[in-house]
Amino acid sequence: MKIAKDSVMAETIDVLNIDEIKKLIPHRAPILLIDRVENIIPDTEATGIKAVSCNEPYFVGHFPDFPVMPGVLIVEAIAQTASVMVAATTPDFTAGTLVFFTTIEKARFRQPVRPGDVIE
């Protein structure tokens, strides 16, 4: 889940763990879909990391015999990564403020995300 933009503002942040993420965005289990965010370059890029467990609640019904992470949740994980990048690098950002996508163009899912996968 790499988020990219065009300009660079300030210094990079190497990694934010789950506790630091929770201080920045309001999402909580079961909808908090990133475990950490790495390589945050302000206004430019960030990499969200999610270790997908067999215990994820959405696997119960999607699909019981062939569990696959729903694409809409992958997009949500990308949005959460972007929110963390904005929150962590914007001066005077109010923690817990919601950040929204306005458009997503040409999104493609190259392969199913299954239990045991780690997505970036």
Question: Which residues does each predicted region cover?
Answer:
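Iron-sulfur (Fe-S) cluster-binding modules
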Residues: M1-K2
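Hydrophobic beta-strand-centered segment that forms part of the acyl-chain substrate-binding groove
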Residues: D6, A10-V15, A82-E120
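Short aromatic-glycine motifs in intrinsically disordered, low-complexity regions
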Residues: L16-R28, A95-G96
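Catalytic strand-loop segment that frames the active site of acyl-thioester-processing enzymes
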Residues: R28-M69
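Active-site helix/loop of acyl-thioester processing domains in fatty-acid/polyketide metabolism
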Residues: V37, M69-F93
